[in-house]
């Protein structure tokens, strides 16, 4: 292992220890203080069915804390229920271009526009993401890239294709009223076209957290690695191995029922990508994404964000994202 790799792994371990062991990603709209009822064990199938179809927001009193020490023995045969609001009163929700940390049950359709993509015109994307909890410990997140349209790195005509499908198993490491920690492993499949800079096979393990101790302030983030593999990914597309990190503080200004501006949160997400392989310069890229999210009513949410690179080289000038979400 190189010195650079050792430093990165040491940093990851330090972050996990500081945020996890030293502490005492909807759970969308549950309120009330957390309780600690006796766990009711179900069959694996029953727990999955109730997690996916049950009224998981009606009885927040059935929620209880999960500890890191029982990650292999507790919660796997219990239906997922929405966790209560954090200690400061903020709901557990997701936002655009930031790590989740918490479990959710929802679907979101997202449109993205990228200006000056690879210095060769614009890029337009459309995707559908689903968050599907199977029990209190395990969830599947899927990202279906319905369309990716750009001129590639050197093309003169726009080409539209299906993108790279991503499926992400997620495990809750621990959860209290104030903090949720999760381990996620995203599997990117090369279903897209290399012309669009897709067709990449990669594994991306991440550690993520969500926290709320004081009023409407929520801090989320995490660290991970982007690990591409295969001849097409590395040689044809030029995918690079990278260390990634994210932190996204935000503040909630309105109550849930103040529609169409309910649960109004403004946030700024900072994303860092540091290339760590030997296939080129080991550059570090940083971008800032200010964003907003609001509850329109009937568990429909509107999300928007603008990502702006702040380091060079810049892969694009700016990227606009808009999402329409339904919590179910």
Stretches found by the model and what they are:
Residues 1-2, 22, 266:
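Charged interaction patches that mediate protein-protein contacts
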Residues 2-10:
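Bacterial N-terminal signal peptides that target proteins for export
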Residues 11-20:
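Bacterial N-terminal signal peptides
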Residues 23-27:
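Sec/Tat signal peptide C-region and signal peptidase I cleavage site
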Residues 28-328:
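Transmembrane beta-barrel domains of Gram-negative outer membranes and organellar outer membranes
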């Amino acid at each position: 292992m190189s010195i650079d790799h050792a430093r990165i792994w040491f940093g990851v371990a330090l972050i996990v220890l500081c945020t996890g062991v030293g502490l005492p990603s909807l759970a969308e709209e549950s309120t009330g203080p957390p309780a600690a009822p006796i766990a009711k064990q179900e069959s694996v199938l029953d727990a999955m069915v109730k997690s996916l179809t049950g009224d998981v927001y009606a009885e927040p009193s059935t929620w209880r804390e999960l500890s890191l020490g029982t990650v292999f023995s507790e919660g796997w045969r219990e239906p997922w229920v929405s966790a209560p609001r954090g200690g400061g009163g903020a709901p557990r929700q997701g936002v655009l271009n930031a790590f989740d940390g918490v479990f959710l049950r929802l679907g979101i359709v997202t449109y993205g526009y990228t200006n000056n993509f690879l210095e060769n015109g614009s890029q337009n994307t459309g995707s559908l993401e689903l968050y599907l909890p199977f029990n209190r410990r395990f969830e599947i997140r899927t990202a279906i890239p319905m369309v990716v349209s750009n001129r590639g790195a050197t093309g003169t005509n726009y080409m539209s294709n299906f993108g790279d499908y991503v499926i992400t198993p997620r495990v809750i490491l621990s959860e209290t009223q104030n903090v949720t920690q999760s381990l996620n492993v995203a599997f990117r499949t090369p279903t897209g076209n290399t012309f669009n800079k897709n067709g990449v096979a990669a594994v991306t393990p991440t550690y993520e957290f969500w926290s709320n101790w004081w009023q409407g302030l929520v801090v989320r983030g995490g660290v991970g690695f982007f690990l591409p593999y295969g001849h097409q990914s590395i040689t044809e597309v030029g995918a690079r191995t990278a260390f990634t990190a994210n932190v996204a503080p935000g503040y909630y200004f309105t109550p849930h029922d103040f529609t169409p501006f309910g649960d109004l949160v403004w946030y700024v997400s900072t994303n860092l990508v540091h290339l760590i392989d030997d296939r080129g310069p080991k550059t570090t890229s940083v971008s800032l994404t200010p964003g907003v999210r609001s509850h329109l009513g009937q568990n429909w949410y509107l999300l928007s964000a603008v990502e702006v690179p702040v380091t060079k080289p810049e892969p694009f000038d700016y990227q606009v994202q808009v999402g329409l979400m339904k919590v179910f």
